[in-house]
Curated annotation (Swiss-Prot):
This is Small ribosomal subunit protein uS10. The gene is rpsJ. Belongs to the universal ribosomal protein uS10 family. Part of the 30S ribosomal subunit. Involved in the binding of tRNA to the ribosomes. PANTHER family: 30S RIBOSOMAL PROTEIN S10 FAMILY MEMBER. Pfam families: Ribosomal_S10. It comes from Cyanothece sp. (strain PCC 7425 / ATCC 29141). Keywords: Ribonucleoprotein, Ribosomal protein. One of its GO terms (biological process) is translation. It comes from the Bacteria. NCBIfam families: PRK00596.1, rpsJ_bact. GO terms for cellular component: ribonucleoprotein complex; ribosome. GO terms for molecular function: structural constituent of ribosome; tRNA binding.
């Protein structure tokens, strides 16, 4: 009864390239399991599509338009019972520049 709320680290990852995101998730989960912490995930969240509509011509032809889109892929990883060794290993982990990482304790 003493430890009702167990310690948890929640890691949110965002990237435009899903392959980079998946390899980063694998690295994080492997690091957590090597340091004897239990990892849940990666849990895929809905992908955000942002569509931009641009006129093709600089002057006339309003009917001629072009659409561009960016897709933001997101994942969540929960790490339960992290030791100081786990936190240190996660801080030293080298991840690609195209992946945005947000960590909550």
């Amino acid at each position: 009864m003493a430890n009702l709320q167990q310690q948890k680290i929640r890691i949110r990852l965002k990237a435009f390239d899903h392959r980079l995101l998946d390899t980063s998730c694998e690295k994080i989960v492997d690091t957590a399991k090597r340091t004897s912490a239990s990892a849940v995930g990666p849990i895929p969240l809905p992908t955000r599509r942002r569509i931009y509509c641009v006129l093709r011509s600089p002057h006339v032809d309003k009917d001629s338009r072009e659409h561009f889109e960016t897709r933001t892929h997101r994942r969540i990883i929960d790490i339960y019972q992290p030791s100081p060794k786990t936190i240190d290993a996660l801080m030293k982990l080298d991840l690609p520049a195209g992946v945005d990482i947000e960590v909550k304790l």
